[in-house]
């Protein structure tokens, strides 16, 4: 907070290298809303929520930058990540505070993206938006019980499963037939698995046992793949002490041996969510070591 948090005119945001993006500000609000010290940071959380709404258009869509970079960017691509993150942040802030304005604005944005990403999925599909919008629609279903949100979760995650590798590196989310969706990446595997955990819970909640089984199978395959990317033994060729990378998850099995925080954190979040939905007994059967 002392390094990157800024506040101007009642708007709170993260600024890094002269830029401030919707996705980072959404993560800021999520962190504050989840904090056990929320009361201490309540004014900053309120400012961060206003910062997200400052990037909301009249039709409910979002803009990706509060402070734009000095280089060209693809706003539509960035929003496949940031829009769902912003929705989740606003809803989690509402759940924490009960301030209905943020629920209403999140619902308004959700309606835009239901049309953009779900009803028109054939024209606009990109897998990066699936997990964040899944989590957002799961929250909205819990709050409203509107069937359209459950149906959206199923539409998105049924489509996502087309990306999962079932023949070569089983469990990863990469299909060579659709290279436009990106190269294999453990962070993607983790966040897709996290989204599928919420989709699994939605299927269970609505009594759709066929989908629940399909999603759980995909989750378990993904966790096995992620486990294969985890550093569990010391590397003879590395000069780093083992504790520096033990348990870390490398980015992919091919060339990228670097570990990233989000490779591990999305996986942790997926396992925690699934454990909450399944219960501790079944959760104990997850891939050991993760």
Label the predicted regions:
Residues 1-290:
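Glycan-recognition and catalytic cores of secretory/periplasmic carbohydrate-active enzymes
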């Amino acid at each position: 907070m002392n390094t990157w948090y800024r506040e101007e005119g009642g708007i709170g945001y993260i600024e890094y290298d002269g830029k401030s993006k919707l996705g980072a500000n959404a993560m800021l609000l999520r962190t504050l809303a989840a904090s056990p010290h929320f009361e201490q940071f309540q004014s900053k959380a309120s400012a961060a929520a206003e910062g997200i709404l400052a990037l909301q258009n009249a039709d409910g869509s979002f803009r990706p930058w509060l402070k734009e970079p000095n280089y060209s960017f693809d706003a539509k691509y960035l929003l496949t990540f940031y829009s769902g993150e912003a929705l989740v942040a606003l809803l989690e802030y509402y759940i924490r505070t009960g301030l209905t304005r943020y629920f209403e604005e999140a619902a308004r944005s959700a309606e835009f993206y239901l049309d953009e990403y779900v009803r028109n999925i054939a024209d606009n599909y990109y897998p990066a938006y699936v997990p964040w919008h899944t989590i957002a629609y799961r929250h909205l279903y819990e709050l409203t019980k509107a069937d359209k949100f459950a149906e959206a979760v199923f539409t998105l995650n049924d489509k996502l499963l087309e990306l999962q590798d079932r023949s070569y590196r089983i469990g990863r989310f990469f299909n060579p037939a659709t290279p436009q969706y990106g190269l294999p990446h453990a962070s993607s595997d983790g966040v897709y698995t996290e989204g599928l955990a919420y989709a699994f819970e939605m299927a269970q909640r609505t009594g759709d046992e066929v989908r629940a089984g399909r999603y759980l199978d995909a989750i378990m395959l993904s966790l096995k793949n992620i486990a294969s990317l985890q550093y569990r033994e010391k590397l003879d060729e590395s000069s780093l002490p083992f504790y520096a990378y033990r348990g870390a998850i490398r980015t992919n099995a091919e060339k990228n041996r670097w570990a990233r925080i989000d490779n591990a954190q999305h996986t942790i979040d997926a396992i925690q969510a699934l454990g909450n939905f399944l219960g501790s007994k079944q959760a104990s059967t997850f891939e050991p070591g993760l």
